[in-house]
Amino acid sequence: RLVGSEMCIRDRDVERAEKAPAARNDILAKRFGLPMEGYTYYFTYEETLPHRRQDFWQMPCALGGDLSQGDDFCSFVFLFPLRNGNFGVKTRNYISSRTLNKLPAAMRAKYEQFMQEGSLVILEGTVLDMMQVYDDLDAHIVHCGYDVRCFGYDPYNAKEFVERWAAENGPFGIEKVIQGAKTESVPLGELKKLAEDRMLLFDEELMTYAMGNCITMEDTNGNRKLLKKRYEQKIDAVAAMMDAYIAYKHNPEAFE
């Protein structure tokens, strides 16, 4: 049985939990002893609006690669540290022609928009050939004049790509980013603050789309990680941006 004052506290907590979804998991865990993992859309609509178009010709950058959906979607982000703490952001993504052909009509129209802006490349075949991806990305880097100083990658499905990168560009500044709340929580928090302050200068619709889809999962210690289960709602470019950001943070001397 609950005594009166305890009842009031409990009611107040229930009311708070209903009104503030973000606080809900905290309250359920602390007040009612129910461990909850919270799912939240991470970026607000305003934070995902693209900036005016700009080029980062011959500028130093960190590259992030998320190759984990090798048969389906492969994502790279170039992150350019700018003056006053801003970051330029450009993305290049790959899918196979089979993946494109299997898309529902509405989704296909969206992907065609990405193809037109140059953020999405279709490679012939059933699954992506990582060496073909490498060749295209390499040509893209040369064409855009990007000066890649470090490379962060999610190790899943990345072995031959990373080995070739090290062979051709040297082993320096290559960072393996293990997925999970322990690694992801701090960089995600910092990217969120940068997005809030409109300091991530992206101008591509694909980046807007990935950020809008981005759901994070919070464990009971308040650590966050990206939720990647949603097959059709692509967030790979956000994962690649995080990989690039971690590589940048771990290699400050490369940008001096």
Task: Explain the meaning of each model-derived region.
Residues 2-9:
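Short, small-residue-biased leader/transition segments that mark boundaries at the very start
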Residues 16, 21-77:
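Conserved helicase/translocase motor-coupling segment
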Residues 66-70, 81, 94, 153-158, ...:
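An acidic- and aromatic-residue-enriched active-site/binding cleft used to recognize and process polar
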Residues 1, 164, 168-255:
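Metal-dependent DNA phosphodiester-chemistry modules and their immediately adjacent helices/loops
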Residues 71-84, 235-244:
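Acidic, metal-ligating active-site segments
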Residues 145-157, 162:
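Short glycine-rich phosphate-binding loop at a beta-alpha junction
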Residues 141-150, 169-174:
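Short, surface-exposed connector motifs at secondary-structure boundaries
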Residues 80-147:
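Nucleic-acid-processing active sites and adjacent nucleic-acid-binding tracks
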